[in-house]
């Protein structure tokens, strides 16, 4: 009886330690992490107040400067950023120029701006932004899968067509 129990235990142990058992667990975990990130992005996009040029115009005219995170940019930097925005037909931000954001703003200020478009996950790609407070450090330290599907150094020039351009991000919705 005891020998049967030991043999059964050892066979279960051998199966539990097999490479197949280990290789499937990280795969499941990574899929769960990716799925969670994609759900977060969908929620952010749905809640974003700006999904088109019309939304942007409406936001700019109805939001007081004191409540508008875009007001943190210099007038020239704001204009370059706004002119660079590309939206797709699904109401998603598909690409933008981030050079002025990175040069003029802190990490949390960039996060607030990108939240207007449901694209706050791209903040982690702007590695030269200033870190000046606890919020900046928290955002910088947060894990992100921003690089998955978003291409730093490329601009969205047409549907599903990214072109190599410094200080631009071509997003998965291009």
Labelled PLM ranges:
Residues 147-174:
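Secreted, short cysteine-rich peptides and small extracellular cysteine-rich domains stabilized by multiple disulfide
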Residues 17-19, 158:
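Generic detector of short, well-ordered, non-transmembrane alpha-helical segments enriched
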Residues 1-4:
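Positively charged n-region of N-terminal signal peptides that target proteins for export
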Residues 7-16:
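Bacterial N-terminal signal peptides
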Residues 20-146:
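N-terminal propeptides/leader regions of secreted preproproteins
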């Amino acid at each position: 009886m005891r020998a049967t129990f030991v043999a059964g235990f050892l066979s279960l142990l051998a199966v539990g330690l097999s490479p197949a058992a280990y290789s499937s667990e990280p795969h499941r975990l990574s899929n769960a992490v990716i799925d969670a990130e994609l759900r977060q992005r969908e929620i952010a996009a749905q809640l974003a107040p700006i999904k088109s040029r019309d939304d942007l115009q409406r936001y700019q005219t109805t939001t007081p400067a004191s409540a508008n995170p875009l007001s943190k940019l210099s007038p020239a930097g704001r204009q370059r950023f706004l002119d660079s925005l590309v939206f797709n037909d699904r109401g998603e931000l598909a690409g933008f120029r981030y050079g002025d954001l990175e040069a003029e703003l802190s990490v949390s200020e960039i996060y607030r701006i990108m939240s207007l478009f449901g694209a706050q996950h791209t903040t982690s790609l702007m590695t030269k932004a200033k870190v000046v407070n606890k919020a900046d450090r928290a955002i910088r330290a947060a894990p992100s899968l921003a690089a998955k599907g978003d291409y730093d150094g490329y601009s969205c020039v047409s549907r599903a067509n990214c072109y190599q351009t410094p200080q631009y991000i071509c997003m998965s919705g291009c």
